[in-house]
Design a protein with these regions (language model features):
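Iron-sulfur cluster-binding cysteine motifs and their immediate structural context
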Residues: 1
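Conserved AdoMet/S-adenosylmethionine-binding subsite of the radical SAM
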Residues: 4-154, 158-162
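Short, flexible, mixed-charge acidic loops at enzyme active sites
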Residues: 161-169
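Conserved small/polar residues in nucleotide/adenosyl-binding loops
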Residues: 173-174
Length: 175
């Protein structure tokens, strides 16, 4: 599909959008598709459509060429939905295999640039529910100037059957 095809498809649903509505792009990971999204969001903005990116933030870096493309995409984006899985870097590495430093840097950068964002945090029992970590998450969010909403989401087991179908043990699930 082309950006034009996707916009044409999205516009079919415009009569159902309330209060103006808009387009939210999620993943996989939306920031891995920046070239496509830049073209898609240019078309959407030409139609006056509100644009949102749902991201885990992991690909973010200030290194080129990523950073220039990100800035172009950021300027076409009205709202970012950003997941903060774990504020503690060591625990984040244990949970995801990656540092959270680039995710926290993205949140700070978006705030510094005046970009609106919603922060989401999933409560996974014994993994992301430590009181000290939750307090530090709140303290970090309090430093951000453009957070419009914080969503604390309960962990659910809806993906378990997919893990089982793929023959991969889901380490987050205990019966």
């Amino acid at each position: 599909r082309t950006p034009e095809d996707l916009l044409k498809q999205a516009l079919r649903y415009k009569p159902y959008w309330k209060n103006g509505g808009g387009i939210t792009v999620s993943g996989g990971e939306a920031l891995l598709q920046m070239d496509f999204l830049i073209e898609f969001f240019k078309l959407a903005k030409a139609e006056g459509i509100h644009t949102t990116i749902d991201t885990a933030g992991n690909p973010f870096t200030r290194e080129e060429p990523f950073f220039a493309k990100f800035n172009e995409l950021m300027n076409l984006t009205d709202l970012f939905l950003l997941d903060i899985k774990q504020i503690n870097d060591d625990k984040h590495r244990d949970l995801t295999g990656f540092s959270n430093s680039n995710i926290l840097d993205l949140a700070q950068y978006l705030s510094d640039q005046g970009k609106h964002m919603w922060i989401r945090h999933v409560l996974v029992p014994t993994i992301t529910t430590d009181e000290d970590d939750l307090r530090k998450t709140k303290e970090f969010i309090d430093t951000l100037k453009t957070v419009d909403k914080v969503e604390v989401l309960p962990y659910h087991k809806l993906g378990i059957t997919e893990w089982e179908r793929l023959g991969i043990p889901c380490l987050l699930y205990t019966s």
